[in-house]
Curated annotation (Swiss-Prot):
Annotated family: Belongs to the FPP/GGPP synthase family.
Keyword Cytoplasm among UniProt keywords: yes
Single GO MF annotation: dimethylallyltranstransferase activity
Pathway: Isoprenoid biosynthesis; farnesyl diphosphate biosynthesis; farnesyl diphosphate from geranyl diphosphate and isopentenyl diphosphate: step 1/1; Isoprenoid biosynthesis; geranyl diphosphate biosynthesis; geranyl diphosphate from dimethylallyl diphosphate and isopentenyl diphosphate: step 1/1
Localization (cell): Cytoplasm
Residues reported to bind dimethylallyl diphosphate: 102, 190-191, 229, 246, 255
GO biological process, one term: farnesyl diphosphate biosynthetic process
Reported cofactor(s): Mg(2+)
Name of the protein this chain belongs to: Farnesyl pyrophosphate synthase 1
Cofactor note: Binds 2 Mg(2+) ions per subunit.
Reactions catalysed according to its record: isopentenyl diphosphate + dimethylallyl diphosphate = (2E)-geranyl diphosphate + diphosphate; isopentenyl diphosphate + (2E)-geranyl diphosphate = (2E,6E)-farnesyl diphosphate + diphosphate
Length: 342
């Protein structure tokens, strides 16, 4: 796996070099240096799970056959396209959320001399994806499907982000809107499609499959993405900041988090009043009251039960799939996220 990771990182260097010498634009030394630094700061710094899972998925769909160098390169290039998409979302997301840290370092727009140039950097990151696809996939029979896939998933993610942002609008904060179905909608569109479905869809296209024949796989992956986001919501409050690489602010930010939805479900009127009075306020005293209520309601125990039930349900869905290769792929995904701490 360490070897796969280093191979994957080598492909990043190749793609970055191609983008820094893209013939469609005449770079000056300053602009090339800016882009070089911007890419290194934002693209390769995460866990790389989404990108690496394209290679894993492709290998499993080929029944575990060893991939040749060309196949590894192409699967890696698609994996990096997803990492580029992720970088684009995060750079802009951090501006919108006025965040401070990301992956254990200051958000890009917080770096001296960057500021709002980060907005254009986000647009550039998004535009690098079709450049990479054109250079390496233009002759492939699935090229148009790849372009369609990335466009559709980006649309779904941006639309999920919209629901997330408008539910947290200043002056329109209304906890009574926060339900499990709203939470699921935000998660499905904002996270599940690009984090879970997209890597597998890329691998399916590479092995010549038609995505319309794999709606069941998409549904299982969206369920997995929902489970992943519930873990994220849980870790935002109960995870160790040094482990997760960021300081959680869901309570201050009035996020439609799984925790607040469950708290609303389980609270009596008095406890609901504590939530209504304190949720979405930046003062640490208000945040502490919400966290104390979460403890009072034993949300850690409620989460543990949710985690085991979700796991069982996902395993049952996966084992109902007719293809052993697809089962292996989905189980490997689930194995990576079950009981994760970061």
């Amino acid at each position: 796996m360490a070897d796969l990771r280093s191979t994957f990182l080598n492909v990043y260097s190749v793609l970055k070099s191609e983008l820094l010498h893209d013939p469609a634009f005449e770079f000056s030394p300053d602009s090339r240096q800016w882009l070089d630094r911007m890419l290194d700061y934002n693209v390769p710094g995460g866990k790389l799970n989404r990108g690496l899972s394209v290679i894993d998925s492709y290998r499993l769909l080929k029944d575990g056959h060893e991939l040749n160098d060309d196949e590894i390169f192409l699967a890696s290039a698609l994996g990096w396209c997803i990492e580029w998409l992720q970088a684009y979302f995060l750079v802009l997301d951090d501006i919108m959320d006025n965040s401070h840290t990301r992956r254990g370092q200051p958000c890009w727009f917080r770096v001296p001399k960057v500021g709002m140039i980060a907005a254009n950097d986000g647009v550039l990151l998004r535009n690098h994806i079709p450049r990479i696809l054109k250079k390496h996939f233009r002759g492939k029979p699935y090229y148009a499907d790849l372009l369609d896939l990335f466009n559709e998933v980006e649309f779904q993610t941006a639309s999920g982000q919209m629901i997330d942002l408008i539910t947290t609008l200043e002056g329109e904060k209304d906890l009574s809107k926060y339900t499990l179905s709203l939470h699921r909608r935000i998660v499905q569109y904002k996270t599940a499609y690009y984090s879970f479905y997209l890597p597998v869809a890329c691998a399916l296209l590479m092995v010549g499959e038609n995505l319309d024949n794999h709606i069941d796989v998409k549904n299982i992956l969206v369920d997995m993405g929902t489970y992943f986001q519930v873990q994220d919501d849980y870790l935002d409050c109960f995870g160790a900041p040094e482990t997760i690489g960021k300081i959680g602010t869901d309570i201050e930010d009035f996020k439609c988090s799984w925790l607040v939805v469950k708290a609303l479900e389980l609270s009596n009127d008095e406890q609901k009043k504590v939530l209504y009075d304190n949720y979405g306020k930046p003062d640490p005293a208000n945040v502490a009251k919400v966290k104390a209520l979460y403890d009072e309601l034993n949300l850690q125990g409620v989460f543990t039960e949710y985690e085991s039930k979700s796991y069982e349900k996902l395993v049952t869905s996966i084992e109902a799939h007719p293809s052993k290769a697809v089962q292996a792929l989905l189980k490997s995904f689930l194995g990576k996220i079950y009981k994760r701490q970061k």
